[in-house]
Amino acid sequence: MLTDRQLLILRAIIDDYIQTAQPVGSRTLSKRDDLTFSSATIRNDMADLEDMGLIEKPHTSAGRIPSEVGYRYYVDHLVEKQIIDERETGRLEERLKQSSKESEILIRQAADLLSDLTNYTTVALGPNSQMETLARVDFMPLDERRGVVLIVTDQGHVEHRTVMFESRVAPDVIEETIRLLNDRLVGTPIGQLKIRIGEEVAKLQLAQRQQYENMMQLIQSTVGIQTPSSLYLGGKKKIFNQPEFQTLDTLRPFLEWIDEQERLTHWLESLPNREIYVSIGSENGIVALQNCSVITSDYTLDGKTFGTIAMIGPTRMNYRHGVQMMGQIIEALRRTKLDE
């Protein structure tokens, strides 16, 4: 159990190190207006904090830096619960609304905004479209032999495929086929569409089958492609701005990891569903992130849990600001309506 004085000193050490990236000594702390203790008292408490594993001495300096344990204590006990700034959330909501009504563009914009607000790299994971349900099927003709099939999901995800007819198909046949599919298949999970369209073809009477079977089968072929969760990356190069990532030995593992989209997607999908959470260094369980902290949260659009967004920075990240900005973005996304 830390004394009130030790809490103040630990907070001051971490706050100072976050700002300067330089080890902190007792002399530096004694000059702070918010610490009215002598250098000797501060040195004694710093020795106790080091014995508890909350701070550590780097090889090349007389000062101290936070340890992973220290950062965890700081995040759990010294980072105050942030209150949503209604004015800031409103501004972010307006910026998201101006970007698009399509979920993919909104999520990408949210990732970019969060990166700009924090100066950290961000990753946003959209839903796996196979887990969504069909909202509607549309068709846009390009010419007499070609057109684009649009599959729109309940969460605003849009998949489009260009199709080519072997021979000209009458516009009324196309229109009626789309109507039949929408009447019978809206609400079907995307992953089951291929089977369901086949079932609907089998139900058609002979006269209908001659008219609509080819068109239905053509549309059926477009939904057979498995679509992974959408992944959006913001501010990838911002890691270059951090003093901890100025050498190839520290930078290369991070860049190689973040460039492997399949592995990155799997990692985000494996995170437990929860509100804002901070994982620090080795807690991430990934070698490339051993010098990083990650702030993650689920987010919602139109009242539905939509995906996960993560902010990645050094373990020396500004946790207060990061948690605050994550909360603002999550709230702005929650308030944004796709159909307005």
Swiss-Prot record:
Keywords linked to the UniProt accession = Repressor, Stress response, Transcription, Transcription regulation
**Record GO biological process:** negative regulation of DNA-templated transcription
Citing just one GO molecular function, the answer is: DNA binding
Classification via SUPFAM superfamilies: GAF domain-like (SSF55781), Winged helix' DNA-binding domain (SSF46785)
Domain of life from the UniProt record: Bacteria
Q: What does this protein do?
A: Negative regulator of class I heat shock genes (grpE-dnaK-dnaJ and groELS operons). Prevents heat-shock induction of these operons.
**NCBIfam families per the record?**
hrcA (TIGR00331)
Q: Which family does it belong to?
A: Belongs to the HrcA family.
Q: What is this protein called?
A: Heat-inducible transcription repressor HrcA
Instruction: Give me the gene this protein comes from.
Output: hrcA
